[in-house]
Amino acid sequence: MRIEKEIKNLLTTRNFSSEKNQTQFLRIQNWFSTHRLNSRQKNKNSEIKISTFFACLPLALGFSCFLFKKNDIFLEGQGKASKASSFFQTNLPVFKTYHPKLTFETFEYIVKPTALETQTEGSPMIFTPSKKKDFFEKKKNKNDVVLNQNSFFGQPTFVGTIKKSPKPQQDVLQLVEETLFNKSEGISSFLLAENKETVLEQATKKFSGFSCDSYTISSKKLSLVSSSASKLSKSLSASFLKAFMLDEFPSYLQGLNPKSSSFSSDKGVLITKSPALKVFSKKKYKVEVKSSKVKGQKSESDKHLTFFLESTKLLKKLTLVNSKPSPLILFKKEAKNDISNKIVLSPAQKDFSYQTRFSSKQPSEKAKAVSVVVKSVKDSNLLDQKTYKNDFLKEKLPLKNKSWKPFLLSKKLSIKTCVENTYYKNQKEFSIDAIQLQAEFQKVFIEKKISYPFLEEAKALNPQIKTFELFNIKNPFLKQCWSIFFQNEMKNRDRNGISGDFTQSILDQEKVQNNELFLDDTSEKILQNLEKVQVWNDSNGVRAMSGYIYPDTNTRDLEWFLNLQKTFTRERVEPFFFQEKRPFKVNSGIKKATAFFPSLKKERKNSQLLGVEKTNLSPLEILSKVSFPSRTTNYSFSVKPFPQIFIKTRESFLTHPETKKIIYDGPSVILDSKKNFDWSTKHQTNLQLWFQKYVSPLNPLVQFQGNFFCEESVEKISQIFSSDREKKREKSEITAFLPLKLGKNAKCEIDWFYDSELVESFFAPSISSLQIPSEKEQPDAFLNQENIRGMYLTLSEPEDPNKVEVFFPLLELKQPSFTNSIKQSKRFCHKTSFFENGYSSFFEFGVKGNPDFDFSGVFNDQKQFAKKTASGNYRKTLSFFSKNQEKTSLFVQNWEPLNATSWLAVSQLSFAIFSFRVLKSLSDNYGRELLGYLMDLVAALGVLDDSLKQQIQILTGERQTGFRVFLESRKKFTDIVGIQKVLLELYEIVLFLRNSGRNFTHSETLPHGILLTGPPGTGKTLLVQALAGEAQVPVIVLSGSSLMEPGESAAFKLQLVFQEARQLAPCIVFIDEIDTLSSKRSQLLQNPMANDPGFESFLESFLLQSKPSQSVKKTESFFGKFKNGAKKEFDNFKKQKKNPAEYNSKQNEKQVSLLSQLLIELDGIQGRNGVVIFGATNRPEVLDPALLRPGRFDKIVKVGLPAQKKRVEILQFYGQTLGYQKTMPWAYFGERTVGFTAADLATLMNESALKAILNQSNHTIETLEHGIERLTTSESEKYTVLKKEKEFKNKTTTPLLNSSRIYSLRLAYYQAGKLLLSYALETHPKTMRASLWPRRPTLRSLAITANLEKSLFEFARLWELTERIIGCYAGKAAEFLFLCKFSSTGLSEISTLGLEDQVFAQKLVYFMLENCHFYSKKNAIQQAMKMSPNSNLKELRKKPEKLDLYSELLNTIQFPPMWEASERETSSLTLQKNKEHSGIGFEDQIRYSSPWWQEDVSAEMEFKPKNPGKGSRLYLYDYERTSRNPEWVPPDEFYHNSSGLKDIKNAFVTLSDQKLYSVEKATQNKRKELGKVLAAGFSKKENEGTKNIKKSSAPKASFTKNNVFCEWNEVSKLTRDYPAHSLLLQSFNKALVILNQNREILDRIVVELLYQEILKKPQIDDLMKELENSKPKTEPNVFSTELQFDASKKAPFVELSWGFQSRKPIPRWIDFAAVKGETT
């Protein structure tokens, strides 16, 4: 830091005058230089750690989020709007802001009316409807209180009167009697007290508001109405209402059945209802109870426990009634007499429901009103007096009206079907899998049971106890309490006393004191233990975070729960948790709980319950006799409100878009379908997500700040805007589910009372869209009120003849994201937009009064709607739980509850993991490219070397390493066939690799390098794989071509290969095509001494240093005299076309460096213990000798072509999978596949398998033949021979004259001639298959032929080769015999048929003459005595690159580029000249410019004077031969294009003509003598086959002395060609004679071939045997292959004559008689 400050001061002052400053400046410079060097060195040595960047990324993003959030809070505090948003708040759904939406799914759940709130303190208030029209009149009674609920966003405004509840001292039974059966007083009243009716009436004509519970009601029979849109026929589409059966829907408490709400108005009473659950007993009761002074109060944190008791068990009891979809229904006004198509949504058969009423706002209230209803009916039909069988109630509660029926169950929803309407017949059904939904709901709900965990302890003490198996405690706290109690209690009890029923022994100890019902001893013990072990409320959050099973269970909850059972337990009554569990729902006035009523299974003598025997009594009858306790323990608690949405109605109207006629004018429900749920297609995932987000108890909208922190530290201040006034509220007043809202320290006594009328919630169906598309041609098709989407609700008794149905349309608006402050508009209209494709809307929609939504940018309300907030300043995802408030106060504590989507617990970690995964994928996919760009940039700056860059690219994977690693090979020796001989040499390698970890003496003697040689496809690679599989070692595979890539270091890649091999040792390194890596090096010094690794390594490194080429320097000096433009032109030409010699030299340098690296790795300083090198090549002759010496490749294994037996084994091995026929001629296919490699045989069997699968058979002869043909040949065109055509009918024409038939016969005779001669010649290979239509050979066939020829001619005799040449001309000779009769027709012309055989015969003849020298010994001498045509090689021997340069320049001069253009132009002019009809004139001759170098040379040498150089002032030793002398001219370099050899005819010009004449005459005399000898030696009898052959005497050609030029090097070719022509002619004549002698056999083979088209060897053998047997026995041999001679005088010939006119006119023989001295 001190040095940095000094630097700053110096840079600011810039004063270096003083010595001190100068010294300080130098010191700073030194510090900078050393720091720069150290940092560079550190950066070079340090590795790139991308993980560090990834680890710091979440921290940086989180810090940025913190800064953005602080900025937003600061700007909001100053009243400014902040546009900045953090990364998390923008991208994560946890922090997204959503406006409250009212979707049509809201109406698909069970709703209940909005509870009212009182503004008075005192006794409980009862809310009842009234029929008074003028509600705003003054209060008539003193006890009446005006109730006015605050109006805020989404909540309707209700105004009504309430009355205090009756006095608690009133007789309970009398009140029940007056309430239940006072029919004359009016059924619409809720409570009759003191003969005064308390009413509440709607103040306006608006539709009453609804509030949807966060959970829907479970029901056995629940008909929902959903909406769907689909296309109809005739391009009609509409949204429709459909009823479908759904078995299960969740709720806060299973079994909850809120009743319908009744509101009286001018038009009638609105009554709707929803069914209940089947949860009660078999008895049929309808009892309403009222109690007083119930003081039990429950803690707030027990709500989850009571909500979910036995929820799963109730779900399991519910079954699907009807899985078929219900018929389509439309909510309409029900006709009076139309009952046939009426569908009634009736409740379940056995139901139980309750309803709570509360109205509380101030936390200091002490008295509340609670209503409890318990009812049970058999079915939807009303119960009459006959079905009412409760004798006890009949006595105590006499009926005042015998025709009385419980009207509470008669509220029905009238629905009329639309079966007769064809509009709905073809609609797409909206179906849902109710069974699957039921399974989903069962997984969502949490089962919480409270029972005793005494099973294990009780069984240990008394094995006879069996009733304990029904119970289990899941709460750890209760389990601990019970365990302590049970152990202490069992020690004190006598075990003999509990040998019977343990339950009965507990019941005997129950006591009743002071008319209060106490628990048994077990419960009392538990309460005592609870006092000792306290579970405080403030530990709930910690327990939830710690993962407790029941974090919401504390001491107060358990005490309340146990004390609650006092109301249901009496003396001699078994505790409910020891009996059969039957769910019973009760409302205690404190909090709704789930309890289990006792089931009195056993009758006991002398047991009474308040004087009434219990044997025939149900639990309700027991409760009716019980006098509830007047005093209980008081527990202070507060109930938090539950989230709830408020749906508001408005006066709206629908008008026709064209006529402007009002179709409907009245109340309606406004919806918004921007955010909806796809229940039909994604009900599984959507339902789970919906529950987790909106319904889960861990949702912040349900779990409030007080529950999270266990206390409310800071009071929230919210501001709610109303249309008339502004009020501040303590909290957002969301309707609570429970009837109490008390303060934490509040204590009160609860009055229980009866209520005859209950407000039921109703089921409100809806649709999703306001616009109904229709065609413009029929706009009035549905313009009536019946087709307006909405709902009809019956508001009176079903049997009431004056019932009224009110229709409420469902209208949809879309809420925009903008709001404007514009003056309020009393009335405005919002028109819907037209549909595309010719559709328009039916209605125009408008709203009267103040709208709830801003659906227009022009007309807007001044009201600023509240924003839905949750979890502090953040807003959660979309929900229909509306906290309709806007936080305007600062200093509000931000908190985040612990839930599944919490940022503190999960979001940050998940986002970090997500970011890490994304960045990891980016680094995997694009990291190499980015790193490559970075390295290119660094290399361009000069910091990174090119070689180092290449190494980094290989290490990072940007470039390929050139090898692959196979850690495991599945091939074994059993998977390879025909390698028995090779296995003996490879087993020792397997032994070495398997025992590489052991030390044995002979390990070093085993070969560490093996070279596999052989033709391609013989299985070298497969052999290495099998070896690796047997040795169980990895294999590193590389090829020479993969290392030799341009711009890369092959030596470095090879070094990486062996480094990897040493790490994987023991392993195998397999180098395929090793000849590309180790070709022979030229001009190398061979070491005649013993192997010296040090000297060889030094020699190899010395050879790597190649001298730089001087061609560039000489080229510059050569062109130094020319102009700059010419030089540039030549440079561009040199760039476009590189010098081949220079390029080859560079390639040679790379090749030598790669070979040297390979030699060093094979036998260098570094060892390769456990690494075995395998090399494979098919050209071992090109390998460098240094590679093949011992120590590198110790053993050379030749993998040749498989023999016949091995070929058969390979065919059988690959055919065993599919199978083959039993009579398969394997010997035939073994001979048929001569020359095939193992890979060829495998491919053959694969093709055969495909053919066999198509034929649905095994391998057959046909499939194998098909495989051979597909491998070796391709398709060819076929011609017909015997096809009947019109030419046969014409007698004048001959069928054989047809060209196609002649061609077919040509083919037949050609194939027959080859077949016959192969059997006639002794050493010629026999024909295996003859086809009439020969197929074109493929490249693979040529390779097979090459392999066969190479193996065949390794050792061959002269006679064998001669017969092969004769066999090559057999087909052509047979073709000539066939066409000899058609010489006059012109069809006997020579064809190209059999060109391949002729070419092979010519190559074979050249092989015999040039390589084998069978016929001419002079040819070998002449080839060795060749002379050099010029002295180019001698003069430029040290500069081979100039030879290529001069040859290229010479070609350019002789054939310049303009010459080709001139030729093209000349040819085009010639073509134009030949066109006689063309009227275009001839163009003038185009003049081409001379070459640039020619102009420069002529200007320099001829037309300009020479400019002699100036003399040198320096003394030169030899100025003539010194390059510094300006007058010195270097010697010329000559390149000769012509040959310097002379014509051999001019070599003997010095000889006289007389000598030539004498030599010629002597030769003629010698020929005459030899002719006489031959005439005497041959028989006078001519052969029958040669009679028809006419001798033709051609005129002698006259040659001049100067018409042919022949140099000495051409003499060897003449010497070769002369006997070659004679040998080919003699072979053809031999084939022609043999076929002519066996003409009958040839014709028979042709007939068979034309008939069968394909002849195989078995058929050919049978045909030959048949022809042999058909010959006369006088003839000794079927085939005549020898010319007949006169046996009178025999001469032992050694060499026959080539002909009288040939260079070998006489034969050579040995005269044994002359040798022996005998006379002839």
From Swiss-Prot:
Membrane spanning residue stretches: 48-68
UniProt keyword list: Chloroplast, Membrane, Plastid, Thylakoid, Transmembrane, Transmembrane helix
A matching Pfam family: AAA
PROSITE patterns: AAA
GO cellular component annotations of the record: chloroplast thylakoid membrane
Origin superkingdom: Eukaryota
GO-annotated molecular function: ATP binding; ATP hydrolysis activity; ATP-dependent peptidase activity; metalloendopeptidase activity
InterPro entries registered for this protein in UniProt: AAA+_ATPase, ATPase_AAA_core, ATPase_AAA_CS, P-loop_NTPase, Peptidase_M41-like
Keyword tRNA-binding (UniProt): no
GO BP terms in the entry: proteolysis
Subcellular location: Plastid, Chloroplast thylakoid membrane
Membrane topology term: Single-pass membrane protein
UniProt domain comment: Lacks the zinc protease domain of other FtsH proteins. Also much longer in both the N- and C-termini.
Stated family: Belongs to the AAA ATPase family.
Protein name: ATP-dependent zinc metalloprotease FtsH homolog
Organism (species): Chlorella vulgaris (Green alga)
